[in-house]
Amino acid sequence: MKIAIIGSGIAGLTSAYLLARRHEITLFEASDWIGGHTHTVDVQLDGRDYAIDTGFIVFNDWTYPNFIRLLERLGVASRPTEMSFSVHDPDSGCEYNGNNLNSLFAQRRNLLSPSFLGMLRDILRFNREALRDLAEERIGGDITLGDYLARGRYGRRFVDHYIVPMGAAIWSMSLADMLDFPLQFFVRFFKNHGLLSVNDRPQWRVIAGGSRAYVAPLTASFRERIRLNCPVWLVERDADGVTLLSPAGRERFDKVVFACHSDQALTLWQANTKIGRAHV
């Protein structure tokens, strides 16, 4: 079959890698590079070279089993790393790192700080109650993180110096926007990544040489089928297949894989026919 793949992030590249074995694929990428969130920068410091990842950085053995198998098949090496969370607030002077007790109480005055100790109690309470509420289906789809924190009367130190900045760091959002984040997705993500547990946590890993190291071997078998700077403008579906409109013109394909964000896919999709609406 002739298959169009829209997007060259990990979803698009893996789809192309697997489908290219038996089908004629064409991968469309609107930007001038492939890899999606994969972005590695070379930095020299004190005579040493470092590959710094600024997009996709880490993965773990709990939630990335297929990605780990893919790296093994490609012969791409990875190594274990540590994940920790640090806060420095110049306004309040609060500073800590959650890696161990010594770094948690790096400011020794926090050993006797009611607000800091209250934050630690709130962390344990949130971990316990959020998991329970998720399991008992007491978190509605319309409840936000801010709603839940207000309803649970969590302290300002916990809100401002732990849960909100941690979420903002993970999803690259402002602190204000983080409060409007859907709670159900938030808790499920934290649970799946071991962030609601003090002891039982996954092993985090990084790709040796930076995350870019997997892109070349992954695309080696179909690199000539990749079109850079070639955004898809429109996708039309009919009973016999799909038509794509791009800078290359109108082209027919048997199937299309939307490996882009959902809002982008909906923009491209022509849902003005019965068959289109049924598939949307």
Predicted regions and their residues:
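Helical element adjacent to the flavin cofactor pocket in flavoenzyme catalytic cores
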Residues: 188-246
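Flavin (primarily FAD) binding-site architecture
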Residues: 258-273
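Conserved small/polar residues in nucleotide/adenosyl-binding loops
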Residues: 275-280
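N-terminal glycine-rich dinucleotide-binding loop that anchors FAD/FMN and/or NAD(P) in oxidoreductases
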Residues: 41-67
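Core beta-strand elements of the Rossmann-like FAD/NAD(P) dinucleotide-binding domain
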Residues: 247-255
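Mobile amphipathic helical/loop "lid" adjacent to a hydrophobic cofactor/ligand pocket
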Residues: 61-183, 187-188
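Glycine-rich FAD pyrophosphate-binding loop
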Residues: 20-44
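N-terminal Rossmann-like FAD-binding beta1-loop-alpha1 element of flavoenzymes
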Residues: 2-27
